[in-house]
């Protein structure tokens, strides 16, 4: 466990010298601010209102933000497992299983860091108007339950989210689902990169990212069941299970999403360990 953790931390240390990490950070800030948070700030300023720190669960409701969040995760994990000139020496020092365990640990923790970055930036970007309240607040409530945001500021927030969840419920559920999907994308790339040129992993990840807008524009709800990115948008998650008789009953329920997502995640981890048993570290693709 100690050697796996050391391998994981070695990957994180490379973040400071990686331009890719800074690109992902800037992408997150620009994406959130331009597509959702800047209009919320303008509304709050014009109405002389504060903004509650609960924007995070609204973000994936915008299909473009949802898709770009998946693309950012693909960009973050496209070079997993991290291989450079010193990797063979680290591999010999730690051992095969510990090295791969460290790579998997890195994916899980980096997915956590990725979502923490989304959450913190959604709060920091409204600092001038930030208002601490356990409720949704007047700004988010007004934008979610009226059309004033659409006509005056070009933004619409989910009224369904406000009606179905308290802020803390929405934050906790959104964070857990988005971490799971980010980790799933990371493990898919890691698993495929162990055995195939890295371009194939990026193609597979890109296909998953594009499933969400495809599901929105398709007739029926079948694609929502096979689109992990869609599972991060709570408007497309049936939290009531079989007891829901509304239109929400057509969407995948929370139990299905959790079981399916974790099953895929564990399957990818198992495939990685089993398939890597006799693979040479020198055979790993870096392109």
Residue ranges and their predicted role:
Residues 191, 195, 262-287:
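Junction motif at the cytosolic side of a transmembrane helix
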Residues 8-12, 16, 97-109:
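Interfacial transmembrane-helix starts/ends
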Residues 24-29, 200-213, 231, 286-287:
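Central hydrophobic cores of alpha-helical transmembrane segments
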Residues 32-80, 101-190, 194, 227-260:
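Secretory targeting signals
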Residues 76-92, 96:
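Transmembrane helix boundary and interhelical loop/hinge segments in multi-pass membrane proteins
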Residues 1-27:
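Aromatic- and glycine-rich beta-strand/loop motifs that create alpha-glucan
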Residues 19, 95-97, 197-203:
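Membrane-helix interface segments
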Residues 35, 196-226:
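Transmembrane helix segments
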